[in-house]
Regions:
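Short, well-formed alpha-helical segments that are part of the catalytic scaffolds
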Residues: 12-25
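Short aromatic/hydrophobic "clamp" motif used to bind/position activated sugar donors
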Residues: 87
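A conserved acidic beta->alpha catalytic loop
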Residues: 22, 37-48, 91
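Glycine-rich, basic loop-to-helix element that forms the pyrophosphate-binding segment
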Residues: 66-82
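Conserved nucleotide-sugar donor-binding catalytic segment
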Residues: 126, 130-215
Length: 289
């Protein structure tokens, strides 16, 4: 099987049929759909059971329920259950273009035997099919996920499809007292060893929330300090990245975690000389709230 299309969901029962419809419309059905329910209290289970029993599906659908732990823990569960060569995270409130799997197959076959690649990535668009993020002119681009931002200045979410074996190699850390982990932590780790092939085709449609998402993300980063510290610490220590990029990450480290890292072990601490940026982190915290 080529792809595991994976959907983590939490109280989004009413949106799952729309996503399912976009999967039914795929021109290439070489995929399975795994839904991991992260502790929903609505009728998600009944909706999925109805889809499995009453709809005509020419692709496998599997549903798993777990206690609420956050999207990253649902991803870890999905990776463990996946049968596809590739792992594609598709959120419950989003859909795929009709030729998404077909395009993934075409571009993945170009790099399938190249072990230096972790996978491929298409573009995201809004529901009017306008591209989200930086407008790019390339047809294909080979670089790491991290390089796409700091080297090629490509910003905005993309639609990454990663080899399942590599997702298993780089699971999200899980903490009992936290329910969020930035995906950047895993992408940065993957970037240290693998490239990805970007192709300039929209394969993923979602609602673009300008402003609101960044505010919510900031609150999550502040609340889930261990995962946040680990993410920014590893970026700061990535010597291959430009120094200004690392400085900005160090400022964000202090902005979201204050002095909390001093109460934990070395795993979460920056080297002593980065404390010079603590005042800028506090200033950013006061400025942005």
């Amino acid at each position: 099987m080529l792809i595991t299309i994976f959907t983590p969901t939490y109280n989004r029962a009413e949106l799952l049929p729309r996503l399912h419809k976009s999967l039914q419309e795929q021109t290439n059905k070489n995929f399975e759909w795994i839904v991991v329910d992260d502790g929903s209290t609505d009728n998600t289970k009944e909706v999925i059971e109805n889809i499995i029993l009453q709809q005509e599906n020419d692709f496998p659908i599997r549903y798993f329920y777990k206690e609420n732990g956050g999207k990253h823990t649902a991803i870890n569960r999905g990776v463990r259950e996946a049968n596809g060569d590739l792992f594609f995270i598709v959120d419950s409130d989003d859909i795929l273009t009709f030729n998404s799997v077909e395009l993934i197959s075409i571009f993945y076959n170009q790099i399938r035997d190249k072990k230096s690649f972790c996978g491929v990535s298409g573009m995201r668009g809004d529901f009017e099919s306008n591209k989200i993020g930086t407008k790019v002119t390339f047809d294909i681009l080979d670089c790491t996920i991290a390089e796409s931002g700091y080297k090629y200045h490509i910003h905005g979410d993309k639609a990454e499809i990663i080899r399942t074996s590599i997702m298993k190699e780089f699971p999200f850390p899980e903490y009992n007292d936290e329910n969020f982990c930035p995906e950047a932590l895993v992408w940065n780790r993957i970037s240290k060893r693998y490239k990805i092939r970007y192709f300039n085709k929209i394969i993923y449609l979602c609602k673009y929330l300008e402003g609101g998402l960044s505010y919510q993300q900031a609150k999550l980063l502040e609340k889930n300090k261990k995962a946040t510290m680990l993410t920014y610490k590893e970026i700061v220590e990535s010597v291959e990245k430009p120094i200004l990029f690392r400085i900005r990450s160090a400022i964000n480290f202090w902005r979201y975690t204050l002095l909390y890292s001093f109460f934990l072990g070395k795993k979460y601490r920056l080297k002593w000389y980065w404390i010079i940026l603590l005042p800028l982190g506090l200033f950013a915290r006061c400025l942005k709230g």
